Regions:
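Glycine-rich oxoanion-binding loops at beta->alpha junctions
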Residues: 1-2, 52-107, 116-117, 155, ...
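Accessory alpha-helical/coil subdomains and C-terminal extensions
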Residues: 100, 108-113, 119-134, 138, ...
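C-terminal non-catalytic interaction/assembly regions of soluble proteins
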Residues: 257-412
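N-terminal phosphate-binding or glycine-rich loops at protein starts, especially the Walker A/P-loop
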Residues: 2-54
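Gly-rich Lys/Arg/Thr-decorated short loops/hinges at beta-loop-alpha junctions or inter-strand turns
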Residues: 4-10, 69-83, 142-152, 179-182, ...
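Short, ordered loop/turn segments at secondary-structure junctions
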Residues: 13-15, 43-48, 81-82, 114-115, ...
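Short glycine/serine/threonine-rich phosphate/pyrophosphate-binding segments
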Residues: 17-27, 50-51, 93-95, 115-123, ...
């Protein structure tokens, strides 16, 4: 394929993670060093920044600050939850994107996000092909939910899993100091896939953690749940439970759904308040001391507990997206595949068609969940343990983390 010269845009979308900026660094640094990419732009708040022509000139940033992106949590360029309509129904946004691309001679578009972001990538790529504008579009994976289809795991997941396991080990210590027992219910993110909540099993396996784990891969039954909690509490004098925010009844309704009717830009229910709800029910049923804990945003931005493996792989994903695009590849998402070399975990990249990834979800294999549907098996531990290895090389100022400070100079 012939060499394509032009500018590139990197955008971030969806929920932030501890390592999404590491992927942005991988894209930006590789693009700045490429002889084919003439200018590197960062879209403010994802695709909305493209639509509004608010693009940061990344060549104006201090290289040292760009390096710090690898250890800076959240989305440094700004994120969004903006659903693109089908261009056959309404192509207004697509015409605007094409206009902005032409203005800045954008020939490479990299979008860093999860399921919905890959859908956006796919739609933009197909539209550009339809109108005959050459632009290579690549998806860079990101989601703490770990539910992107076709990839062994997703950047961001391992760091969140490590944070969850560590936090539950600490909560366990706190909950066991008194002479009166406590029932502790910890709510963890995950609407349809329980990868994050399952990570709580690491705390139990390698220290002290939950006695019971409930995932959205199986139907939740309140009576069975209460019986499980009462059994453990009676046997041990205490009980710790990890629950996914997305646990649901057999009819598909979320246990926490009655607490809120809010939705995001993609129509997904805004879940939350499950721990408090279950704690109230358990307290009424048992009369025991019960505490509900919601990890909330902390589990996705804990850069101080990030996995160095996760950081390195996130950079690798961004770098691979640029290298493959410059080589002539388009319409793909960078994915990970796992290998074992001399008994050690090795991660390599592969490419998946965007059409195979967009709007599909990967859930925990049912065979990794125990028969009682209140815990996970060793297969899951074997899967996740290599991913959380290594400590982040955080720079510090006055013993506090020094995160990247971008100038964010808007392109003209």
């Amino acid at each position: 394929m012939s060499e394509l010269k032009g500018a590139c845009i990197i955008g971030q979308s969806g929920g932030p993670t501890s390592v999404i900026n590491a992927s942005a660094y991988g894209v930006i640094r590789t693009a700045l060093d490429s002889g084919c990419i003439t200018n590197v732009y960062g879209a403010e708040h994802g695709i909305k920044g493209v639509l509004e022509d608010r693009l940061f000139d990344m060549s104006q940033e201090d290289p040292k600050e760009l390096e710090l992106l690898k250890y800076t949590p959240s989305s440094a360029l700004g994120s969004c939850r903006y659903k693109m309509k089908d261009p056959d129904e309404d192509d207004t946004d697509y015409k605007r994107i094409l206009e902005v691309f032409k203005k800045h001679d954008v020939r490479y578009f990299f979008y860093n996000g999860g399921n919905d972001s890959m859908d956006t990538c796919n739609k933009i790529s197909k539209y550009m092909q339809k109108v005959g504008y050459e632009c290579r579009v690549m998806g860079v994976p990101k989601t703490i939910d770990n539910d992107l289809y076709g990839t062994d795991h997703c950047p961001g997941y391992a760091s969140a899993a490590k944070y969850i396991a560590t936090s539950l080990m600490e909560v366990y210590q706190d909950a066991h100091v008194y002479d009166t027992g406590m029932i502790c219910i910890v709510e963890i993110m995950g609407r349809h896939a329980g990868w994050l909540t399952a990570a709580a099993a690491l705390a139990t396996k390698y220290g002290a953690g939950p006695d019971l784990i409930y995932l959205p891969e199986t139907d939740f039954d309140m009576d069975t749940f209460l019986a499980d909690v009462q059994r453990v509490y009676k046997e041990t004098g205490s009980c710790m439970v990890a629950v996914s925010e997305g646990i649901h009844y057999a009819d598909g309704s979320f246990v926490s759904e009655a607490k809120t009717s809010a939705t995001d830009g993609f129509g997904h229910a805004q879940l939350g308040g499950l721990a408090a709800l279950l704690a109230s029910i358990v307290k009424e049923k048992t009369g025991a001391k019960v505490r509900g804990i919601e990890l909330s945003l902390l589990q996705r931005c804990g850069a101080h507990l990030a996995s160095e493996t996760d950081i390195e792989e996130a950079v690798m994903a961004g770098r691979a997206a640029v290298e493959n695009a410059v080589a002539g590849i388009t319409d793909k998402m960078v994915a990970f595949e796992r290998e074992t070399v001399d008994g050690h975990y090795v991660c390599k990249t592969k490419l998946l068609p965007l059409t195979e990834v967009a709007n599909f979800e990967k859930k925990i294999p049912i065979e990794w969940i125990n028969d009682s549907h209140n815990g996970v098996k060793q297969e899951f531990i074997d899967y996740v343990l290599p991913l959380i290895q290594g400590e982040p090389k955080l720079q510090k100022e006055n013993s506090l983390p020094r995160f990247a400070k971008l100038k964010k100079v808007l392109a003209k």
